[in-house]
């Protein structure tokens, strides 16, 4: 008699805990290293309260078993089992399966095996389901349920005898509130943070809304750091703020910063079970609340029991990747020296993100914390100018490169170098330096936009930063021109809302064609053509198509190009043996190397300099991984 996992669709809340438990169980109980490695054998179809988990039915006389030409699939122990060593990737089983639950992964069939190799003997998905919507069933049990339902229906008791739904009892009735926000009329007059931190009552309210889907929940998985989100939210419920801060710092080096600048709507909050029900739990605000509150109470990371090691590591770059790497190494007892060409730590966090999103005193406080942990910072120190790369590789046991991507993408339009046309990063950096009391630099000259018509080309978060900075600098008008529709904008939804509230005008579905200048060569307008959304490209995003005859000019005194970032030149790497790809990014993790190890084995790299411009949290995760790889290298040498 066959056994299989049966789902009670009415009780499924769409939390995806079953998928995560399955993927983790088949990865030695560890998080998969990447989303491409996330391969659950059970799948939730639909979403919210219309969701339903689907897995292999382990059929008697299974069509997949009959179809397999090499006997890789056999019926044993009341279930259909797969011998991956025999599988030849012919796909006959996937075609034969009437339920579509046999997949091909890297040319090998994959299906539910009822966790037959799991030491506990239990099925991971059943074990973790918060509403008990999954159960191990056989044909006899299924028939009994069917007969019982038929009898109730015949007796007219199907509805009157219905039990209260477990899923309905679990889901909260309170809707999301989030953090208070300063009014647009007030906040656009200054550069202070616009979001107020949660107070204890607000934090309790939000934490009480969490349904604690599972210890390893969907929000954990969609956080690149795999923060223990349900667990630290539970600690907030219990009033254990110090313990929550300790837990946050186990997986994150900058939780108070991520709580402010992470695009939670695309990560943890976007994966929250309550997103389409009563609104996602305000995870980012809770993360900020935990760390801000704990630090205000005097909490600091305790490194008093750290045993010093003999190794020394040089970290190039004091951005999120470098700080993440230094944090892990310092906690392991390694002596760490961080080198950065800027006068303060943080990289883009300090000089690329405006103060109204991230107050710079937050970075100053974090620098004090890292210094107290034993990390030495060498600022205003540029590799190749103040110290050579070969000096670092000869003096240190390992080197980490986390320099980010500071190259700016161009549009290749006529007159792109005309007066009044500027790039986003120099614009943002110059004004941030001014607010910090730093002198104006030749690399980052100030741009006066007061009383001028400002147009920003782009649609990401950097675009929003330029727009909102221009508003605060008293521009006469500020307009965003983006070639796709609003739904296709790559930036955070809340940043678009904030910009619109503050007075930014949006021109969607317009593509730049040229830059118009007067007889003196100064900018007067940007030539645009309207677009219509076409079919999706290889990346899944719909492509804009120019609409013939729709050309027009948008007057502008200042035009800011915000098309994103790419690798910048690193001449100090020449002759080192470290390989770059065709985009100028550092190559790591080739066969025979650790994931973040370059072709020069004592040099590691991570963050945007390896993967291209991405998020603060992904850069930090890469830096922390590099530190773990270094420790693996050190321990291997020691043994």
UniProtKB/Swiss-Prot annotation:
Protein name stated in the entry: Putative oxidoreductase UacF
Residues that coordinate or bind [4Fe-4S] cluster 4: 68, 87, 90, 93
Keyword entries, A-Z: 4Fe-4S, Iron, Iron-sulfur, Metal-binding, Oxidoreductase, Repeat
Cofactors required: [4Fe-4S] cluster
Residues that, per the record, bind [4Fe-4S] cluster 2: 22, 112, 115, 125
Keyword 4Fe-4S among UniProt keywords: yes
Domain 4Fe-4S ferredoxin-type: 3-32, 47-77, 78-107, 110-139, 201-235
Transmembrane segments: none
Binding site for [4Fe-4S] cluster 1: 12, 15, 18, 129
InterPro entries from the UniProt entry: 4Fe4S_Fe-S-bd (IPR017896), 4Fe4S_Fe_S_CS (IPR017900), DPD_II (IPR028261), FAD/NAD-bd_sf (IPR036188), FAD/NAD-binding_dom (IPR023753), GltD-like (IPR006006), Helical_ferredxn (IPR009051)
Domain note: Contains an N-terminal 4Fe-4S dicluster domain and a C-terminal pyridine nucleotide-disulfide oxidoreductase domain.
Record gene name: uacF
Cofactor binding mode and count: Binds 5 [4Fe-4S] clusters.
GO molecular function: 4 iron, 4 sulfur cluster binding; metal ion binding; oxidoreductase activity
């Amino acid at each position: 008699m066959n056994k299989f996992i049966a789902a009670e669709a009415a009780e499924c809340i769409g939390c995806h805990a079953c998928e995560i438990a399955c993927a983790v169980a088949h990865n030695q109980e560890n998080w998969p290293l990447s989303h491409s490695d996330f391969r659950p054998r059970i799948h939730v179809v639909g979403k919210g309260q219309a969701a339903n988990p689907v897995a292999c039915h382990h059929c008697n006389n299974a069509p997949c078993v009959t179809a397999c030409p090499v006997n890789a699939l056999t019926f044993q122990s009341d279930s259909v089992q797969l011998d991956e060593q025999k599988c030849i990737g012919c796909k006959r089983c996937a075609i034969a399966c009437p339920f579509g639950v046999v997949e091909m992964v890297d040319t090998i069939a994959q299906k539910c095996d009822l966790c037959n190799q799991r030491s506990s003997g239990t099925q991971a998905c059943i074990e973790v389901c918060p509403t008990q919507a999954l159960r191990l069933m056989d044909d006899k049990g299924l028939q009994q349920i069917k007969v019982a339902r038929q009898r109730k229906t015949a007796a007219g008791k199907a509805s009157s005898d219905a039990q209260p739904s477990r899923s309905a009892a679990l889901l909260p009735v309170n809707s999301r509130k989030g953090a208070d926000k300063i009014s647009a009329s007030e906040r656009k007059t200054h550069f202070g943070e616009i979001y107020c931190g949660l107070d204890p009552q607000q934090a309790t309210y939000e934490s009480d809304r969490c349904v604690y889907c599972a210890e390893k929940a969907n929000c954990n998985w969609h956080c690149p750091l795999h923060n223990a989100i349900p667990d630290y939210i539970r600690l907030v419920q219990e009033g254990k703020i110090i313990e929550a801060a300790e837990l946050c710092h186990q997986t994150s080096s900058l939780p108070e910063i991520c709580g402010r600048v992470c695009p939670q709507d695309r990560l943890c909050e976007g994966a929250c079970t309550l997103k389409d029900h009563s609104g996602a739990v305000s995870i980012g605000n809770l993360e900020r609340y935990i760390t801000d509150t704990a630090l205000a109470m005097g909490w600091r990371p305790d490194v008093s029991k750290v045993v010093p090691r003999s190794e020394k590591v040089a970290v190039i770059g004091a951005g999120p990747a470098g700080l993440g790497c230094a944090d892990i190494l310092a906690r392991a007892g390694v002596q760490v020296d961080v080198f950065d060409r800027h006068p303060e730590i943080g990289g883009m966090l300090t000089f690329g993100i405006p103060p109204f999103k991230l107050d710079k005193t937050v970075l100053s406080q974090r620098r004090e914390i890292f210094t107290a942990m034993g990390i030495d910072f060498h600022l205003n120190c540029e590799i190749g100018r103040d110290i050579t790369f070969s000096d670092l590789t000869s003096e240190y046991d390992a080197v980490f490169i986390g320099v980010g991507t500071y190259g700016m993408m161009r549009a290749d339009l006529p007159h792109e170098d005309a007066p009044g046309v500027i790039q986003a990063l120099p614009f943002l950096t110059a004004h941030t330096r001014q607010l910090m009391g730093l002198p104006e630099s030749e690399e980052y000259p100030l741009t006066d936009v007061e009383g001028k018509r400002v147009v920003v080309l782009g649609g990401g978060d950097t675009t929003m930063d330029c727009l909102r900075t221009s508003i605060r600098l008293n521009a006469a008008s500020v307009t965003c021109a983006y070639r796709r529709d609003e739904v296709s904008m790559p930036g955070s939804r809340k940043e678009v809302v904030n910009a619109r509230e503050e007075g930014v005008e949006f021109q969607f579905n317009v593509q730049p064609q040229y830059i118009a200048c007067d007889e003196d060569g100064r900018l007067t307008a940007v030539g645009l053509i309207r677009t219509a959304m076409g079919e999706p490209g290889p990346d899944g995003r719909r492509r804009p198509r120019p609409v013939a005859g729709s050309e027009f000019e948008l007057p502008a005194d200042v035009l800011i190009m915000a098309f994103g970032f790419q690798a910048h030149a690193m001449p100090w790497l020449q002759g080192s043996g470290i390989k770059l790809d065709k985009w100028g990014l550092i190559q790591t993790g080739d066969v025979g190397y650790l994931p973040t190890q370059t072709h020069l084995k004592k040099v590691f790299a991570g963050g945007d300099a390896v993967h291209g411009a991405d998020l603060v949290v992904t850069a930090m995760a890469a830096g922390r991984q590099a530190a773990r790889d270094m420790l693996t290298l050190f321990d291997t040498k020691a043994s």
